[in-house]
Amino acid sequence: MIPFGSRLHAAIADRGPLCVGIDPHAGLLSDWGLGDDVAGLETFALEVVEAIAPYVSVVKPQSAFFERFGSRGIAVLERVIAQSRAAGALVLLDVKRGDIGSTSQAYADAYLDPTSPLASDAITVSPFLGFGSLDPIVETARTHGAGLFVLALTSNKEGPEVQHARVDGVAGGGTVAGLMLDHLRRLNAEASPLGSFGAVVGATIGSTDEDLAFNGPVLAPGFGAQGGTIADVRRLFGAAAAVLPSSSRDVLRLQDPDVMRDFVVRTNDELRS
Amino acid sequence: MIPFGSRLHAAIADRGPLCVGIDPHAGLLSDWGLGDDVAGLETFALEVVEAIAPYVSVVKPQSAFFERFGSRGIAVLERVIAQSRAAGALVLLDVKRGDIGSTSQAYADAYLDPTSPLASDAITVSPFLGFGSLDPIVETARTHGAGLFVLALTSNKEGPEVQHARVDGVAGGGTVAGLMLDHLRRLNAEASPLGSFGAVVGATIGSTDEDLAFNGPVLAPGFGAQGGTIADVRRLFGAAAAVLPSSSRDVLRLQDPDVMRDFVVRTNDELRS
């Protein structure tokens, strides 16, 4: 199995780095003239996939908006994942899971094992229980050539109380965010051209003293409508091995499939120029 | 709507504090002579619910073990939740979700809105994005009389690197775990007899300097087979307003419905004596 980092590196070279978030919240369904129900969810999500999945390297469905509708919403998510992959996009499922032991293993089985109905190329994970609590997910990712994006340094205003906290016993008084990047640097040390273990770092954090050279990809939410510019991405993430600027609203509000497609193709061109 | 804290207080008085985790991992399904598939999951989970939900105050299904089977596993989870509540147990769904803004709201809708197929009495949440990132979930819980259990001080060996990290600007150099307890103390300040906003604190942490008097319930995993004793629970959590010692393996390995029922009734008697 080709590692996720290698597949992502090739996909970015082929299609560009833009990651499109599929975030079917109630307001968007309403803007599209759809009901806030499973039928509306399905129409919305599959139309977006059909319009953009053949043109972008990474599609990022937000699981929460499917979980809202219980098992029937998850059945739609299964189709979103399968159809996105069939169209040649890598699927980064945004689930922010994290637990310990056999429960972490169960999440790995759910989202990274190719035999699962929700099998994705990569997922987001949350390290509040310590980075090592994610070990079963890391090992499963290695086995199946999948990737992870670990929450590290997000741009929401409430994040610093945890992510900037100082870790005992680290030289220089490192932060929680810095420690997560250190763990990722270790996991990616031998990888070439790109590691499979990424970090979530907000595109609108302004600036950071953290070392983003960890040989893995950065998922950078907040690009576009939420304020992050191409200049921000270049300035903030110059040291990173690869960056996926992630945008959702900018694309989804366009509604018309041709306009959505043109927008993602043009944005990828701008990001690569 | 009666607040979750009040409902939990009454349920503990009526049935005792034991929380039974429903953790149908592959090994347990095999021990029960069941297949590692949706049919095995359903048989296992519904037999456990039928045996113990009429006798315990809180049933805690672990979502990961249902997510493993995609939408069909989630359909089983919907039945587990509904049948547990119909039997008079409160359902604490262990999902450890956490996100920001409209995504946090979507998780709240998924698990705390009574119209959702997965509506539960309470859920576990993860504060890596900062406690305030959970605000939409807190507000939705208040609206619907639901509860939350926020990860704070877990007993897994990897937890301290995040949970013991020192928060800048807090007098005395408070920890991340302590800050989470402070946030909970604020949310529960006016509640009587018990707040609705709880913490997850491992039954096997040994000792702690954190102040557990935050007027909310403590979920204490690790009780029983994982090593936590009744003496540990009394010593560690003497200051807490209410404690839910949580056990899974001890109960589930018994298999026979009558034996499971007798075990949970006897354990509740011991915990109350």
Curated annotation (Swiss-Prot), chains A, B:
GO MF annotations in UniProt: orotidine-5'-phosphate decarboxylase activity
EC identifiers of the protein: 4.1.1.23
Record keyword Coiled coil present: no
Domain of life from the UniProt record: Bacteria
Pathway info: Pyrimidine metabolism; UMP biosynthesis via de novo pathway; UMP from orotate: step 2/2
GO BP annotation list: 'de novo' pyrimidine nucleobase biosynthetic process; 'de novo' UMP biosynthetic process
Family membership noted in the UniProt record: Belongs to the OMP decarboxylase family. Type 2 subfamily.
UniProt-recorded name of the protein: Orotidine 5'-phosphate decarboxylase
Organism: Nocardioides sp. (strain ATCC BAA-499 / JS614)
Lineage of the organism: Bacteria, Bacillati, Actinomycetota, Actinomycetes, Propionibacteriales
